[in-house]
Amino acid sequence: MKLIGMLDSPYVRRVAISLQRLGLPFEHQSLSVFRGFSEFESINPVVKAPTLVCDDGTVLMDSSLILDYAERLARPRSLLPDDVAGLRQELRLVGLGLAAMEKAVQLVYEERLRPAEKRHAPWGERVGGQLHPARRQLEGAQLLQAPPGGSDALGQAAITVAVA
């Protein structure tokens, strides 16, 4: 498998760390969706990071979908709890971490990539108003719960929140 994308992306980091923790071998190709647009487009015409090129050539994108695939490949190893209550709590934290990532990336795009004369202050305030509650809820969360099997490895919620 080959993971395509820059490690400055929290989504690419999330996939890379998770693949390592699951014990799945992969090659990483550090390719920017900005500076390497044409090369990225030749791999994935949608130009979305992370992109995973599977061993059979199938191209997957979106960190959550890639990790769903990885979880199935790695069975019985998993970064998610087996029990429904534990899974529900883990997915709640993953959702908060993903929301924090998404809103932080939106703010970076708005503040660093959009020309100053085209920025819309109410939009930035709205995005910040979504980011801060997600981070506040994560601050007190119990993230260091071991995944199934009594392993001392971090679970998916801890990985997702750490890279956010």
Spans of features found by a protein language model:
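GST-like fold's C-terminal all-alpha helical module
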Residues: 97-164
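GST-like domain detector, emphasizing the conserved glutathione-binding G-site
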Residues: 1-121
